[in-house]
UniProtKB/Swiss-Prot annotation:
GO molecular function: DNA binding; DNA-binding transcription factor activity
Protein's recorded name: Uncharacterized HTH-type transcriptional regulator Rv0081
Record-linked InterPro entries: ArsR-like_HTH, HTH_ArsR_DNA-bd_dom, Metal_resp_trans_reg, WH-like_DNA-bd_sf, WH_DNA-bd_sf
GO CC annotation terms, alphabetical: plasma membrane
Entry annotated with the keyword Transcription: yes
Biotech exploitation of the protein: This protein serves as an immunogenic antigen, inducing gamma-interferon responses in whole-blood cultures from M.tuberculosis-exposed adults in Uganda, The Gambia and South Africa, indicating this might be a good vaccine candidate.
Keywords: DNA-binding, Transcription, Transcription regulation
Organism whose genome encodes this protein: Mycobacterium tuberculosis (strain ATCC 25618 / H37Rv)
Amino acid sequence: MESEPLYKLKAEFFKTLAHPARIRILELLVERDRSVGELLSSDVGLESSNLSQQLGVLRRAGVVAARRDGNAMIYSIAAPDIAELLAVARKVLARVLSDRVAVLEDLRAGGSAT
């Protein structure tokens, strides 16, 4: 059986992350482990059923882990690398946005913005 090329696996991984709610969930879980109730009250912007669906996607991808604590399910990031990935994404985005602001400012000033 032929295995999937690594680039396809990477693309699937990034597709898992390609949803604003999932990114927000991960940002909250990087701070600390949380129950579904805590996530709902943390301005995730999702209804309970949609939150459960998004957590399921993240669990199946191995990005978050869950454990039972009494009646509550407690979610956490599955590996510290997830926190690093989010931090790198933030740095890249800040640089990209900074470059765009510089071009916009140049255009407003009447420059040639090359």
